[in-house]
Amino acid sequence: MAGRGVKRALAALAACAALGASAADEGWYLQVDNDVFYGTDRWYTSGARIARVKSRGDHQVEIGVLQEIYTPEAKRHNDIDRPNAARLLATVARHDRVPGDWRTLELDLGVTGPSALGRQAQEFVHRYVSAPHEDWSHQRPDRFDGQASWVRTRTLGQESSGSPHLDATYGAVLGNQVAFAHAGLELRFGTGGAARDMSSPALRFAATPPLSFAQDGSWSFFLALSTRAVAWNHLLDFAPDLPQSTPRLRHAVQRFLGGFAWSHRLAQVTFVLVHDTREFVGQRRDHGFGSLTVHVPF
C-alpha cells in the first residue's frame, strides 16, 4: 500500500509538472507602450495590447485587441507636425517556435478615426497624469484599418548556454494605412535559458508575447538596431477639410533599442527603451518611448 501511495504521489507530481510546462506556453499578456518614459507627449505617444495565447499542437494561437495613439507635439507648436490619430484593432496571430527560430503571422482588422477611442483613452489617462490639452479635431473621419504582418526571428550561429548570441529579425507589415518592410539585429546576453528565448514587439513590429521554453528563473539584457523601408503611412494624413498639409513621409527610418527580459515560472516580463529617427520631413527631432510586456501563464 505504501509503495502504491508513493507511485501515485509521483504520478501526480509529474502531471503537475507537465501542466506547468504546458501553461508556460499559454496565458494572458499585456503590452504597454508610452513616451512617458522620456517625459514627452508627442508622435507615437501610447499603445496597448491585451491578448490571450493558447497552445494548438506544435504552435500557439493568439487573439487580442490593440490600440495605438499618435499626436502632434503637445508641449510646443511646430509648423510641420502630424495630426492626432488612433487605431483600434482586433488581432489574431499564429506563432511557430522552436529554439532559435520564431515565426509570427498576424492579421489585424479594425478602424482608424474617432471610433478608435483615442481621444477618450487619452483624456482618461490625463485625469491622473497631467499633460497639455490635445486638439482631436485634426483627425480624419473613420476609415477601415486592416493589415497583415509576418516576421521571423532567428539565432545566428550556434548558441551556447551562458554566452552572448546574435539574433536576426526581418519581416513586413502590409495594410491599407501603413506598409513597410524591416530588418534588424539583436545582441542578447544573460543567465539561464528562459529569458534568452524572449524578444520585444518593438523589434518585431508584431504580436510578441514574452514566452519562453524553459521555466527556470533567469534574466537577459539586449541591445538591438533595426531599419524599416516605409512604402506609405496614412496615419500622417490630416482631415481633408483642414488647412494643414500632410507632412512628407521619410521612407527610411532607423530604430535603436535596449532593454531586459526576466522569466520565472509565475510570470515573464520584457522592458525596452526605443529611439526612432524622424518619420517625416520637418519633424523637429527623433522620438523615444518605452515598451513593457507582461505575461502570466495560467
Residue ranges and their predicted role:
Residues 28-34, 63-69, 107-113, 166-176, ...:
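Transmembrane beta-barrel strands of outer-membrane/channel proteins
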Residues 42-48, 84-88, 103, 140-148, ...:
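Residues that define the transmembrane beta-barrel architecture of outer-membrane proteins
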